[in-house]
Amino acid sequence: YNSLGPDSKDSELFVAEKLDNIRKIIAKIICCKPEEVILTQSTTDGINIVANGLSFDNTSNIIIRGMTHEHHSNFYPWIKLKDRISIRNLPIDDNGFFELDDLKSNIDNNTKLVAISHALYNTGSILPIEKISKILDNEIPFFIDSAQTIGCIGEHDVSKLKCNFMSFNGSKWLCGPMGTGLFYCNRKSSELLEPKTIGGESAIIKNDNDLIFKDLPDKFQTGFRNYVGLAGMESSVTILQNLGLDNIRKHIMELSNLFIDEIGKIPEARVFGPENENERTSIVSFEVGKNDPEKIVSALAEKGIIVAKREIYEKPILRISPHVFNTKDEILKLVEELKKL
């Protein structure tokens, strides 16, 4: 066996073609170069590549938002650094938004990174990434957790978002298998990161003991072996592309808005998140009176309806995240079951 599987030319060429093709597909979706796409196991992998790869000193600081309102994967890796650097947390409102002036006031000459989720896993709020990048003005490295946006809010263009790094998942909105993820690393910005995992794919030895990292994507590609998952993600993403990402956005927002309208007819129901549909994904978080979210999840599962229990400020709530395969009839069936509670 070698890094691409069995020692077979046919197998090696097949896997290499899959690797090359998925990078081209993702590069087209986010408007970058194929070599800037690193294959990972999850969004979390990409976040940790950045958190563990940047160089800091004792005067350094990074800026995050939300703390307990943030997804753990885009919170814990930064908090782990708190004994080495200053972690500056932006105050937020009930929907997870922060004031841009607060971001400006927290930036100084020692700010090494701003790390922000593009959209929030609990409220569905879409943060103003382009306004944030304009403030940073290519002077401060910018990391975006796009796990909740790639595949559900239409076309992306990293050149407009002006981010240095972006991580997202293959098994959420891209509908691929578990264990698939993508990490975008701007070619020039790759010089800011030192890999913390090294293997034969990522480096070479010169002059007997001088370790030289390879160029992108190999520099960060150590140990990836989920070729079966990769083939599945290639198929799922191709289907989404054929449907059209903007068409998908239109469809799922119709479902989301339908649910909000219908659940609003239940007196004890409450919906969380922005009212303006341009400020949110199709995610809808809600509660139905004092009913236990865990019990509701179980009751609906018995009816063949899958919803999730999540948290907003450590408060348990229910969440739906309709996607392209869902229908209006399914939304109406969900609401009818909620009325029976």
What label would you give each PLM region?
Residues 1-341:
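Pyridoxal 5′-phosphate
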